[in-house]
Amino acid sequence: MITLGIETSCDETSVSILEDSNKILSNIVSSQVEIHKTFGGVVPEVASRIHVEVLNRLMDLALKEADKDFKDIDLISVTYGPGLIGALWVGITAAKALSLALKKPLVGVNHLEGHIFANFLRDDPPSFPFIALIVSGGHTEYILVEDVGKYRILGQTLDDAAGEAFDKVARILGLNYPGGPEIDRISKTGKSIFSFPKIRCDRELDISFSGIKTAVLYLVRDLKKENKEIPVADIAASFQERVVEELLERAMIALEKFNIKTLVVSGGVASNSYLQKRFKEESQKKGIKLYIPPPYLCTDNGAMIACAGYHLYQKGYKSDLSLEAKPDLLLGER
């Protein structure tokens, strides 16, 4: 079965051709990072316009690289939320047009579902049930995944997503956008010598990054007042360690609470080198089977959407031409 996956939820345009459940024939991604860097963040109207400009070309490139034609496509899969509403509509409109013209089935995919299924693009995918941690620029959630389409949110961020916190702290430290890779890079030259507050929430699997972010802000402000040098690498390393340890602690609590031995981590922040190191160390120590996609599948991409769409379709899920963009779509909502 050949699935065409389309991802346009934020600032990456991506089209992928997938054979059966996990064979990536092509996965073309056009990133807008350099464009939005000048604004210090994603500008929704600009993102939508660029999706319109590049999507058709990416489809042609994806088909060419896969050595396929439109007539070879069996299923069309597209992100329909959550995300930027204008950006989502670009992908949905293209997917519906293809479905109508080719007379092929259409499946709308939750973007977060796509991140989970990025871990299924391998020969030994995780077995249900498992705990999933999605850590990205827009989301931080702990999820009990019981089956395809069956999700239970156990905990989530009460304010900024992890990736958003990285971006904001990077800005405080004078680093470039996007902040996640910058903090990861510069932390390698620093030492975790600053103690930032532990996160406390009413629910044990919820998380909040506002306290850590504020602590960084006050630390930098006080150092400037005293005309002291800002040890950017050390602050970055200390911040990164605190965030990762908090994420890890809650993941282990969730696994123990539900007596599950499989942990799936995905989203852009999952490519952070310190996060990967600590999660691997702790998983090995506790006999947990850990899944983290390769970096190119951690960030937004069409392959994960194609994969999720394939599995949903096999379970009987499908959409029709009334499919609409849902910028605030919740995981498990249809």
Curated annotation (Swiss-Prot):
Name this polypeptide is given: tRNA N6-adenosine threonylcarbamoyltransferase
Catalytic activity, as annotated: L-threonylcarbamoyladenylate + adenosine(37) in tRNA = N(6)-L-threonylcarbamoyladenosine(37) in tRNA + AMP + H(+)
Top EC class of this enzyme: transferase
Positions bound to Fe cation: 111, 115, 300
TM stretches of this protein: none
Record family assignment: Belongs to the KAE1 / TsaD family.
NCBIfam families (UniProt xref): gcp_kae1 (TIGR00329), T6A_TsaD_YgjD (TIGR03723)
Gene name of the record: tsaD
InterPro entries assigned: ATPase_NBD (IPR043129), Gcp-like_dom (IPR000905), KAE1/TsaD (IPR017861), Peptidase_M22_CS (IPR017860), TsaD (IPR022450)
Cofactor remark: Binds 1 Fe(2+) ion per subunit.
Cofactor(s) in the UniProt record: Fe(2+)
Location in the cell: Cytoplasm
Role, per record: Required for the formation of a threonylcarbamoyl group on adenosine at position 37 (t(6)A37) in tRNAs that read codons beginning with adenine. Is involved in the transfer of the threonylcarbamoyl moiety of threonylcarbamoyl-AMP (TC-AMP) to the N6 group of A37, together with TsaE and TsaB. TsaD likely plays a direct catalytic role in this reaction.
CC terms in the record's Gene Ontology section: cytoplasm
Any coiled-coil regions, as ranges: none
Biological process terms in GO annotation: tRNA threonylcarbamoyladenosine modification
